[in-house]
Amino acid sequence: MPQWSKLLSGRFIHRTICFSVGVALLVTPITASAASSSNGKYQNVQFAAEQSGKANFQGSLLTVGENRFLTRSNIEKEWDGIDPDYKPDQAVKAVKELLSLEDYEALFPNRLGSPAWYEIAKGKEYFKADQKDYFSYSNLIDAVTEVANIKLKISHRKGSPGVQEINRLDKDARIETLVSRSSDFNSAKNKKQEIVTVIIDFGTFLKEGFKKDRKRELAAFLANLAHETGGGWSTAPGGELKWGLFWNENIAGRTGVNTSAFVDEASAALYPGVKDKRYYGRGPIMLSWNFNYGLFSSIIYGDKNVLLKNPEIVSADGKVGFMTAILFWMTPQDPKPSAHDVIINKWKPSKADIAKGLSQPGFGITIMVLNGLEANLGEVEGSSVKRRAGHYRDITKTMGVDITGEKVDTLGMKPF
């Protein structure tokens, strides 16, 4: 699960990445600064209160885009250390012991760029002669490996979850980078407010809990992605579930039916769109809008400009595509927990959650975390939940996991 430095709640760029998987919602982002590539000098960053008559709570002394090398002592004190079980070299084992290459390819035979996809796509508008196996098993493993090298620290002023700064830690290099900061984070008023911090170790993906729960996590992750990228229908050859992971671009955006550049003017100063580049939905979570491309670029590369200048990377490189999905899966967005915490049974519902019917940790609640628009739906014909749950049942069966009694739909649930 995401590792918490305190029993705190955090929001992943409050109002910036509030899209549900597959349904990007335009919400005006906060005014902030974001990282472009920069090398900085070592600075002694303090996260405790300074006493000068009244408490003055100081955040990072780095400027946005600046980085510093950390000693092991710094990492222990400021980042809760680095757990060797969650390092990148454990990623290959983490995936392979849960789902084999053969089973993965049998579950998704028509995935984008597979031999079966080429037969289906031949002569179609979307056919690409050079299409690679985007959702390949190796790309999944590479993504799990690469995200395992990243920790994220989200800090906000107490009572103001939108007043944030975000730091990224490269574990192997022991380099910390300040990737984003609200413009008013260190205002005179806000400096009087305590700093609330959450630390997320992306290396915990597929590596926490009993083996059954780790299998359920991979199944839930792939089931939700398969639904969002599915190309099947009820009478599709081989069955609808064999058509998961078929698409990786929003069709209207790709074909130009929707010509929007998907640049939100309110965030353009922070995450400027590049001329002739369009930020329509790409990848397994259909990453959309300039502010999301810039933010995810900052987390993956430590530089907002990589994906702002080259948004097509998300749909061209399957490893990067899977990385965007894992980052989204692992990160809580107050008041929502992360899907990771839910599926491995680390999330404990609050009284408010229980009142909304959000009381049974399982696949159904991961749907609510990812897309609250699918509340109160059962596994009935025409329901999006039917296909999500169908994929989950199919994958867990392949894994040999018994999910009897697990709530896999959203009946009786309201959004967080």
Describe the function of each predicted region.
Residues 2-12, 26-223, 230-263, 336-416:
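Cell-wall glycan-active module
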Residues 16-28:
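Bacterial N-terminal signal peptides
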Residues 139-145, 278, 282-355:
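Alpha-helical segment that forms one wall of the substrate-binding/catalytic cleft
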Residues 209, 270-273, 309-313:
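Short secondary-structure capping micro-motifs at structural edges
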Residues 244-290:
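Glycine-rich (often Gly-Gly/Gly-Pro-rich) flexible segments and glycine-rich loop motifs
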